[in-house]
Amino acid sequence: MLARYFTNLDRPVFALRNLPEVVKGALFSRYSRTEKSLRRVLLDEFINEPDSGFAQLAGTQAGADDMVAVRRAEEFYERVLVGYGDDSVAELAGAHVAVERVSTLAAKALEDSRIGISPLEKSTRYVRFDRPGPDGRYLYHRGPELAHPDYEVAADSLFKTYSELIEPLTLAIRERFPLVEGETDRAWKAATRAKALDMLRGLLPAGTLTNLGLFGNGRAFEYLITKMAGHELPECRGLAQDLHRELDLVIPSFVKRALDDRYGAPAAERISRIRAETARMAPRNHRSGAGPRVTLLEHDPDAERKVVAAALFPLSDAGWKELEGDPAALLEAMLGDRGNRRQRAPRALEHAQYAFEIVANFAAYRDLHRHRMLTQDRQLLGTALGYDLPIGLAEVGMDGRVRSAIEAAAEAHSRMERDAGPALAQYVVPLAFHVRWYFRVNLREIYHLCELRTTPQGHPDYRWVAQEMFRLVSEVHPRLARYARFVDMGPGDELERRRSERRMDEKLSALDRTQ
């Protein structure tokens, strides 16, 4: 009977299967209130307890009406979890949600959640964005709030330029990087196409439609919905309603408060009100020099001592202030034998803290925004900080067309900002334009971020940011930084994806040999 629901019946570690999310969450919640094993709880309190509702719920798993199943699950949850705190229990069950045809701006708002939600988004490196929609038009966000006469003209021009340059640029790249010995045609074509898309991604406006998948727990989704409901963009507020409607069909008990009159709606209104009140105090129209840059705003002069104390603390019986040691010897013991970047730096390094202000193009921001073990926020996307163009576009004579489309979009942005406000004007800004944001990050995450984002196959825009961050940390804390030995400060691969695609071929070949 129980074998259907667990991966084994006789070992202390096992996985759950063939159970609705709400039942899994309810089962795990019982760990805090019973001495029984989970398998015994399922048998005694769920399967053999007629009033639990489990029989009806389990019976809906195989083909019964989905709506009936969900409502039974909600009733089950309420019955079993009376007296439990909803918040912690809501972290014990989750859902997968697909969000399609949303703007890049809205995608960033969805992905801004740091804990409890894991996103994955359509890539500008591997996927063309010029395929028309069912109505034959380019895929960028349109809505009544974006009825400005310049918006669609500028966005269409950006997409048209992007679309018309993909094939000739790909051919030019293939002439510059011909097929080499030992490289398959598949790998070569994939690497050269990715290079072309990388070089042209700066043309895409922030209103470009993208797709993403979200996996998260109920508590995280509840807050995401509330936060989106208080967003300044109408598109994001609409997504709050869409997310709530769809999640109410699969995990209703976990998102029931997200927009309700008692909790969710007042919280969303408060988010909106605080933003408006704070905005009135924030200076605007400040002019600063254009161009990318990374600035170290803050660092802790006492970081070495704190790292030493944090490393010794769990192994000592002394108090924090009494813990002292030789930083060089301790760092060598903890990090001296690191063989690759996947051998993580220890938690003690989290006690060295840094704050950076970064100005880089919005495309690079999108890549670095994915990092979670830090605090970050950005300013509104605009055109005042200038934009980047890949050097390779000038080498093939395509920079003129790209500049023309980008600068026409900048003029449209100026008029939209005047007429519709800076938030809505973001939609027309190409990804090539710079945005300013901050990172507050610890040294452990510096190791992870900089070693990952400086690999030779990475995009040069975010490689440069990661290299600058690491250079600045190395200047103030050379001894703490020296063991991040897998940071690559070199120029990177000219054809960034060539090495990765060749490795993929090797993996595919090995897989074929085993089958």
Can you name each region flagged by the protein language model?
Residues 1-515:
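A conserved ligand/cofactor-binding region detector
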